[in-house]
Amino acid sequence: MIWWFIVGASFFFAFILIAKDTRTTKKNLPPGPPRLPIIGNLHQLGSKPQRSLFKLSEKYGSLMSLKFGNVSAVVASTPETVKDVLKTFDAECCSRPYMTYPARVTYNFNDLAFSPYSKYWREVRKMTVIELYTAKRVKSFQNVRQEEVASFVDFIKQHASLEKTVNMKQKLVKLSGSVICKVGFGISLEWSKLANTYEEVIQGTMEVVGRFAAADYFPIIGRIIDRITGLHSKCEKVFKEMDSFFDQSIKHHLEDTNIKDDIIGLLLKMEKGETGLGEFQLTRNHTKGILLNVLIAGVDTSGHTVTWVMTHLIKNPRVMKKAQAEVREVIKNKDDITEEDIERLEYLKMVIKETLRINPLVPLLIPREASKYIKIGGYDIPKKTWIYVNIWAVQRNPNVWKDPEVFIPERFMHSEIDYKGVDFELLPFGSGRRMCPGMGLGMALVHLTLINLLYRFDWKLPEGMNIEDVDLEESYGLVCPKKVPLQLIPVLTQWT
C-alpha cells in the first residue's frame, strides 16, 4: 500500500514541477546527460558519486547540468570551472542549500560548515580564524600532540616487540580523536562516552551528512523514503550519541576549574557574554554545532590522511625507502622530534601532497547554492542552483596530471603547487570563503605522526599478503576514508 502512495505522490509533484518548468524562460544551461522522469539523474550517481560524476563530465563537459529530483544542480570538474565557482564568483556561490540531515546534526545549522551564508556565518568564520585556528593557537597545542604521539609510539613499540599486526586506520583515528578531545574538549577520549564507539559515530555522522538523501530532493515523499531506507534512524542514532558526548564534555569542563585554554572554554565564555561574537549571543546549541565541526575536521584531516599515506608507502616500496632515508638523515639521533622538522623533509612533503591528490578526503565538496543569477563559462546558472565541486575529478584530470592514477610524489619536485587553496589543480581542503579552517591543526598532527612512524620503525605486511593485496578502495560519505582496514606489522630498528 505504501508503495502506491509513494508512486502517486511522486507523479503529483512531478506534474507540478513540469508545469512550472514550462512557464519559465528557456535558459542556456550547461550541457548534461538525459534525465528520467521524477528522479532526474539520481540513478547515475552510483555508490561513489565522485567517480560517476567524473565519468559523466568526460562526456558532457567541465561544467555539467544535472537534475536530482526537484533540485537543479551543476557540477564543476576542472581547475578552470572550479576557479570560477570558488574564486571569481565565490561571494555569489558561498551559501549552502537546505539539507535535512546536516540540519539535524548541526543543531539547525548552528555550525560553520553547513550554515548558509549570513551575518552569523561571517561572525563564526571570523571567530574560528582569529581565535581557534591561528598559527599561535595551533602551536600552543603542540605539547598535547607530542604527548599523544609519544603514547602512540609506545603502543607501536609493544606490537613491534611481539611482531603483532596493527590496525593502522583504527589506531590513527583514535590518536587524532585523543588529540582533538584534549585540545577542544579538555577531556580524555579514553574516559569519554565515545571511548568504545568513537570511530563508528564519527564515520556514521560523515555518512549521514554526505549521503544524497531523498528528503532533500523530493518534497514530503522523500522523508518517507529515508525512513524506509534507514537513513532517518541512523541520523537520530549518531546525533544522540554525539549530543551526549558534547553534554559530558561541557559538564566536565564546568566542574573542573583546572581546565584552561581549550576550545570549549572559549565558547562557554561567549555563551556568558564574556567574549563577543558580533551582535550574536551564543547559545548551547551554537556551542555544540561549532564543536561538531572542530571534532570532525580534526579527526578526518589527520587520522585518515596518515592512513592513506601509509597505504601508499607500503604499496610503493621505492617511495617508502626514499622517504625513510630522508627522515633518518634529517632527524639522525635527535630524540626531540617536532612538527617543524617537516620543513626540512622535502620528499615527505611531496609524498603527503601526492596522497592528498589521489585520495582527497572530501572528494565532492559540500554543495553550494547560487544566491543570485550568474554566468559561468557562458552558461546560465539560475538562483538557487546547487553547485557541486568535484575535487576527485580535478585532481585526476589527465590534462593536468600525467598518469593521474599512478602514485608519483616526484611530480611535485620543482613545483610550486600546494594544497593551501591557492592552486586550483590541488584543492583537498577547498578554497575561498568555505575553505576548511582547521587544515593547519590537522596537518600539524599529520606531520608529527608520519615523521615518528617513518623514523622509528620499518613496516611490513602480515604473512601471506603481497603489496598487490593492499586495497585502495575508499568508503563513501562526506569524507571518504580507506574502506578496508590497513593491517601492518611494525619492525624495531636502531632508531626505535
UniProtKB/Swiss-Prot annotation:
Enzyme class per UniProt: oxidoreductase
Any GO MF annotation of the entry: heme binding
Cellular-component GO terms for this entry: membrane
Needed co-factor(s): heme
Binding-site residues, heme: C436
Topology in the lipid bilayer: Single-pass membrane protein
Keyword Transcription: no
E.C. code: 1.14.-.-
Gene3D superfamilies (UniProt xref): Cytochrome P450
Keywords noted in UniProt: Heme, Iron, Membrane, Metal-binding, Monooxygenase, Oxidoreductase, Transmembrane, Transmembrane helix
Chief place of localization: membrane
Protein name as it appears in the record: Cytochrome P450 71B14
Organism from which the protein derives: Arabidopsis thaliana (Mouse-ear cress)
Organism placement in taxonomy: Eukaryota, Viridiplantae, Streptophyta, Embryophyta, Tracheophyta
Gene that encodes it: CYP71B14
